[in-house]
C-alpha cells in the first residue's frame, strides 16, 4: 500500500523485526547508488555475524534465484520499478522472490551488490520458520514462468550441487583421492579446452 504513495527515488522493505545495521546506512548507501535498478547490501542475522544470502561469486543468474534468494531487507529498489512490478499480495512468503525473478531475470534489470552492511534480520519470521510453505510458493511461481522440463533440470542441478558439496570435503581427506581428483579435473579441463 505504501508503494503507491512513495515518492522517493528508492525504497526498501523490512519486516517488523528487522532494522537498519546502524544510523549511517542511508548515507553510506547513497554513495553507492549510480542509477541501478536494484542495489543489494549485506544483511546479518540478529545476534550473529552470519550474513544471509552472500553476493554471488559471478553474475546473478536464474540458478542463483532457484537455489536461494536476495535479502529484501538489504535491497534498495527503484520506486518506479516497484510500481511497475508490485509485490504479489496473494503470496504470504515469496512475493519478494517473485519480484526479483520478474525484474532481474525476465526483465533484465541491472543489479549491483555492495559490501555495505544494511540490515539486521530477525530470523523468527514466517519465512524462516516455514520452509515447506516457502518451497511450495516458489514452485508455484516457477510453474507460472517456466516449463516443467526446465524446472526439473534446475532441481537436478541443485541435487548435483548438494551432492558435490557434501562429498568433496570427505573425498579430499585422503591424499590419494585428492590427487586423483586433481588429475581428473586437469584432464577434463584439457579436453574441454580442445573443443
Residue ranges and their predicted role:
Residues 19, 23-53:
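Conserved donor NDP-sugar-binding/catalytic core segment of glycosyltransferases
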